[in-house]
Amino acid sequence: MYRTAASRARALKGVLTRSLRPARYASSSAVAETSSSTPAYLSWLSGGSRAALTSLDMPLQGVSLPPPLADKVEPSKLQITTLPNGLKIASETTPNPAASIGLYVDCGSIYEAPYFHGATHLLERMAFKSTLNRTHFRLVREIEAIGGNTSASASREQMSYTIDALKTYVPEMVEVLIDSVRNPAFLDWEVNEELRKMKVEIAELAKNPMGFLLEAIHSAGYSGPLASPLYAPESALDRLNGELLEEFMTENFTAARMVLAASGVEHEELLKVAEPLTSDLPNVPPQLAPKSQYVGGDFRQHTGGEATHFAVAFEVPGWNNEKEAVTATVLQMLMGGGGSFSAGGPGKGMHSWLYRRVLNEYQEVQSCTAFTSIFNDTGLFGIYGCSSPQFAAKAIELAAKELKDVAGGKVNQAHLDRAKAATKSAVLMNLESRMIAAEDIGRQILTYGERKPVDQFLKSVDQLTLKDIADFTSKVISKPLTMGSFGDVLAVPSYDTISSKFR
């Protein structure tokens, strides 16, 4: 008996070996012959007779094959339609099975009058809550039913509401998205719940020194709307309510200031679904964005502790000056930086200017990184750092020295080529995400009225020279300094002393 079982096992092993050996472009007749000669070993082991076993090269009965991939996929083309009321609908098709759709509004904290401070922050948190047509529970269940994912974000100049799901659910996605933006109910208990969460969020901001300083230098560096807080001031939480949000939306959420953008959706399908839902939005001429003036300034908050956090920044042109905004982006990538401890493993970012010349040389510096905050007409470029209080003055001096060295032409071609390659790869990798692609469409149309081809951006990066980087940096650091410090700031030099380091 055992001998018989072993014999069958050895025979089965031979069958499996022959069955799993790949056929080299077998013809249909050869496949048929192979199928008829292959033993049905499962039946054989159970005592049945040898029968034909269907080849793995043949499709199973009742199972349809997916459509074959095209040999060549044409680049997606963007289509834009402007409705009579001024709202723009834009989309590009992709071979992805999923789609991302967003409603982008030319509205942010710069449009907040003092009475409305914190409105955009609260609107962001009230996104996809109860509407006049749906309870929050029903809305969540409908999004879950289509496997959707929603998000909202608010910035100083723009707001976005997005939804992501399989493209077979485009009608449902568009309807839920537009209902959530156009018809919020602003129920008192939902508003009060989000206000309580905002209070916690504001308290947590003080525990994030870099985020806190980046917010503070806008208030110190600008005069006008850009100095308004992006996060709601704690003093405004008692004043914010549903009626105030409705008033703010009525003033700012008009058709001419909205773009419905999608990635992975046929334009005609999107237009067919969205036009009836948005054509009755009021046709109001777009409001001119309020202007801000860069003035420079100093912000300090002493909280004690064992570290000093600082940020030094200067004004740079905004996205409407495309060449110089691109130069600022490449300069940020060239300067790079990071923390003394890299959570992503050793070697990450270590070829950047600040990493090689500051973090690797001075153990007292815990963090040193370049940053940008660019808007339509203006922006900030600077360096954030963190060190021990005793080393704070030296760390700030090092930040000034490195910017002066770049302005003095000490960057070589290898440094610039690495920064340009990193900039281009970051943009191209981000655009592989359909959600980022939809966001790019919406925000560019709000800014430029069109979407500029990515090749144009890449060409602008390629055209930058060492002289461009040096001249740009020299011009930037000649402007008034904006300075911020947080933590143990007792040893931080005066504003005039720091400003003189850049001259």
UniProtKB/Swiss-Prot annotation:
InterPro entries, sorted: Metalloenz_LuxS/M16 (IPR011249), MPP/UQCRC_Complex (IPR050361), Pept_M16_N (IPR011765), Pept_M16_Zn_BS (IPR001431), Peptidase_M16_C (IPR007863)
Membrane topology qualifier: Peripheral membrane protein
GO terms classed as biological process: proteolysis
Cellular component terms (Gene Ontology): mitochondrial inner membrane; mitochondrial matrix; mitochondrion; nucleus; plant-type vacuole
UniProt entry keywords in alphabetical sequence: Membrane, Mitochondrion, Mitochondrion inner membrane, Transit peptide
Stored Gene3D superfamilies: Metalloenzyme, LuxS/M16 peptidase-like
Signal peptide: none
Molecular function GO terms recorded: ATP binding; metal ion binding; metalloendopeptidase activity
Coiled-coil zones: none
Localization annotation: Mitochondrion matrix; Mitochondrion inner membrane
Xref: Pfam families: Peptidase_M16, Peptidase_M16_C
Presequence range in chain numbering: 1-59
Family indicated by similarity: Belongs to the peptidase M16 family.
Quaternary structure annotation from Swiss-Prot or TrEMBL: Heterodimer of alpha and beta subunits, forming the mitochondrial processing protease (MPP) in which subunit alpha is involved in substrate recognition and binding and subunit beta is the catalytic subunit. Component of the ubiquinol-cytochrome c oxidoreductase (cytochrome b-c1 complex, complex III, CIII), a multisubunit enzyme composed of 10 subunits.
Main function: Substrate recognition and binding subunit of the essential mitochondrial processing protease (MPP), which cleaves the mitochondrial sequence off newly imported precursors proteins. Component of the ubiquinol-cytochrome c oxidoreductase, a multisubunit transmembrane complex that is part of the mitochondrial electron transport chain which drives oxidative phosphorylation.
Protein name stated in the entry: Probable mitochondrial-processing peptidase subunit alpha-1, mitochondrial
Organism this protein belongs to: Arabidopsis thaliana
Organism lineage: Eukaryota, Viridiplantae, Streptophyta, Embryophyta, Tracheophyta
Gene name of the record: MPPalpha1
